């Protein structure tokens, strides 16, 4: 719809000359949220109007809003956006936005060849190689981090749970280990290393927990709803015993059941993780355009791989479902930070995880 309106704007410019943003007077690019605006005011309105606490004008709402002055007073700029008819209800939720992007990428992919080109195949192999070296084998190594005896499969379900401290210590150790392996995985990717160190850190802090759960899903059993890591068996009850809130764990279980039910192949898991990694909207990111292009490339390869490998019936909505699950992971990621702050003992044991979730 936006593209169509932008084309209409271009056509009207040829007939009537350039049209200006009704908020600041800059050149308008189309109708955004029900008003003819520039890209700057469109982005400002999306970022600002949904905040719980809005900006306050120190000059009683009398500031001029123009192209030159629009950044000086966010409160007056926001009020003018509302006065000219921009509507909050037209802003898509994170999930709806992810699904729209998924549909857009799917349409682009359908126009392009569904066969991966040589460069894309090589990129998939690089991702798989890094995943095989650092992430795939890490679950079998959990046993080296002093697990309580009742976590061993041959003890379950008979062995009663022991005191919580050994379990918390084990959880802290394996979470730190997983984050370390995910860092090694990303550092093994030339595209990731090509970014500035500041952006590498910002992307890792934003995506580490999401990549962790995408990878952990490979150990999840849909029938028992347990995670099997080498000789160890983890149940959601173990996390409850350690102090995690039941509602938080329910959202994690829901995610893993939905993802496991899609029966992904290893390349699809890895490409999903790469799509999460290269997210240009993480806090602190500076090279947004470059990272956005990287994410679009990963998403396009993921969609083409699905269309190439899966049956037509199975693949029809798979890509859109994966994009929706990535949106769910954002919510889990945010909730994980709060849980870590609440569990002070676990937080104290995992400084690396605390830094990632800060």
Curated annotation (Swiss-Prot):
Gene3D superfamilies: Erythroid Transcription Factor GATA-1, subunit A, Retinoid X Receptor. One of its GO terms (cellular component) is nucleus. Residues 18-93 bind DNA. Changing residue 336 to A: Diminished binding of coactivator NCOA2 in the presence of TCPOBOP. One of its GO terms (molecular function) is DNA binding. Keywords: Activator, Cytoplasm, Cytoskeleton, DNA-binding, Metal-binding, Nucleus, Phosphoprotein, Receptor, Transcription, Transcription regulation, Zinc, Zinc-finger. InterPro entries: NHR-like_dom_sf, Nucl_hrmn_rcpt_lig-bd, Nuclear_hormone_rcpt_NR1, Nuclear_hrmn_rcpt, ThyrH_rcpt, Znf_hrmn_rcpt, Znf_NHR/GATA. Predominantly expressed in liver. GO terms for biological process: negative regulation of DNA-templated transcription; osteoblast differentiation; regulation of DNA-templated transcription. The modification Phosphothreonine is found at residue 48. It is found in: Nucleus; Cytoplasm; Cytoplasm, Cytoskeleton. Composed by a short N-terminal domain followed by the DNA binding, hinge, and ligand binding/dimerization domains. Belongs to the nuclear hormone receptor family. NR1 subfamily. Heterodimer of NR1I3 and RXR. Interacts with PSMC4. Interacts with ECT2. Directly interacts with DNAJC7; this complex may also include HSP90. Interacts with CRY1. Interacts with CRY2 in a ligand-dependent manner. This is Nuclear receptor subfamily 1 group I member 3. The lineage of its organism: Eukaryota, Metazoa, Chordata, Craniata, Vertebrata. The gene is Nr1i3.
């Amino acid at each position: 719809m936006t593209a169509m309106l932008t084309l209409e704007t271009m056509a009207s410019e040829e007939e009537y000359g350039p049209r200006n943003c009704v908020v600041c007077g800059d050149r308008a690019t189309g109708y955004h949220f029900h008003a003819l605006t520039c890209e700057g005011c469109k982005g400002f309105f999306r970022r600002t109007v949904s905040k719980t606490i809005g900006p306050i004008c120190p000059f009683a709402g009398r500031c001029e809003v123009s192209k030159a002055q629009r950044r000086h007073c966010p409160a007056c700029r926001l009020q003018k956006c509302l006065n000219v008819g921009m509507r909050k209800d037209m802003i898509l939720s994170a999930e709806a936005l992810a699904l729209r992007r998924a549909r857009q990428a799917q349409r682009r992919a359908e126009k392009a060849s569904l066969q991966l080109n040589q460069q894309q195949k090589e990129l998939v192999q690089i991702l798989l190689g890094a995943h095989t070296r650092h992430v795939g084998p890490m679950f079998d190594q959990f046993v080296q981090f002093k697990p309580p005896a009742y976590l061993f499969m041959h003890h379950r379900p008979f062995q009663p749970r022991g005191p919580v401290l050994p379990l918390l210590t084990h959880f802290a150790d394996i979470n730190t280990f997983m984050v370390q392996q995910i860092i090694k995985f990303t550092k093994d990717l030339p595209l990731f290393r090509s970014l500035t160190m500041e952006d590498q850190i910002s992307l890792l802090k934003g995506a580490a927990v999401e990549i962790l759960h995408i990878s952990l899903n490979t150990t999840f059993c849909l029938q028992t709803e347990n995670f099997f890591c080498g000789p160890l068996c983890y149940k959601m009850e173990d996390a409850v015993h350690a102090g995690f809130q039941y509602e938080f764990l329910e959202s994690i279980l829901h995610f893993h059941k939905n993802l496991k039910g899609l029966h992904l192949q290893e390349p699809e898991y890895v490409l999903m993780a790469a799509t999460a990694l290269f997210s240009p909207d993480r806090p602190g990111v500076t090279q947004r355009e470059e990272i956005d292009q990287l994410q679009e490339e990963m998403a396009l390869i993921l969609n083409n791989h699905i269309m190439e490998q899966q049956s037509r019936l199975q693949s029809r909505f798979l890509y859109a479902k994966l994009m929706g699950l990535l949106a769910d992971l954002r919510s889990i990621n945010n909730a994980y930070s709060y849980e870590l702050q609440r569990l002070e003992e676990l937080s104290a044991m995992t400084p690396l995880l605390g830094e990632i979730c800060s």
